[in-house]
UniProtKB/Swiss-Prot annotation:
Residues 61-71, 121-137 are lumenal. The lineage of its organism: Eukaryota, Metazoa, Chordata, Craniata, Vertebrata. InterPro entries: Jagunal. The chain crosses the membrane at residues 40-60, 72-92, 100-120, 138-158. It is found in: Endoplasmic reticulum membrane. One of its GO terms (biological process) is defense response to fungus. Pfam families: Jagunal. It comes from Danio rerio. The gene is jagn1b. PANTHER family: PROTEIN JAGUNAL HOMOLOG 1 (PTHR20955), PROTEIN JAGUNAL HOMOLOG 1-B (PTHR20955:SF2). This is Protein jagunal homolog 1-B. Residues 1-39, 93-99, 159-183 are cytoplasmic.
Length: 183
């Protein structure tokens, strides 16, 4: 705000920022963590959709089993992993602590559990592929065990980060509620 003639008005040169209020760190952290969790939820939804598509195509016999292999047992239970993601999406808009806790617990049960079982279930087939170079199940011409191990690796990372960021977000929310109780 400069005048046509004369000096600039005091307080308009940008030096008046020190008296302004700042956003508390736990609110900043909450926004950042919510953003990360939303990205991870979307990544999980993509992985879940791919697994669901394979199970659906196989069960409905839409294509030959030579093109898309029949699913492993762990893939059926992994389909329940959409439940934690739904609870996570429901928890974020209103900072609902109980939904976030349900999401974390069910994430361990429905996400990490089937992934660990799947790694053990497919290990003999992967070992046979590595030692002898023979694969008996294929997905679009690629070894099914190789593709599903790739899915497992991606899923472990996505779910691990989901649980980690959810715990940090829960801590940020508890900091906020503890501050309110003190006042």
């Amino acid at each position: 705000m400069a005048s046509r003639a004369g000096p600039r008005a005091t307080g308009t040169d940008g030096s008046d920022y020190q008296h302004r209020e700042r956003v508390a760190s736990h609110y900043q952290m909450s926004v950042a963590l919510k953003s990360e969790i939303k990205k991870l939820n979307i990544a999980h939804a993509v992985v879940w959709f791919l697994v669901a598509a394979q199970v659906l195509v196989s069960q409905l016999n839409l294509v030959s089993h030579k093109v898309v292999a029949s699913p492993y047992q762990w893939e059926y239970t992994y389909l329940l992993s959409i439940i934690p993601t739904v609870f996570s999406f429901m928890a974020l808009p209103k900072n609902n602590i109980s939904y976030l806790v349900i999401s974390m617990i069910s994430g361990g049960l429905f996400c990490i559990g089937p992934i660990l079982y799947g790694g053990m279930e497919m290990f003999p087939v992967a070992q046979q592929l590595y030692r002898h170079g023979k694969a008996y199940r294929f997905i679009f011409g690629f070894s099914a065990v190789s593709i599903m191990y790739l899915v497992l690796i991606i899923s472990v990372q996505v779910h691990g980060w989901q649980i980690y960021y959810s715990k940090k977000l829960l801590d940020a929310w508890f900091t906020n509620t503890q501050d309110k109780k003190k006042k």
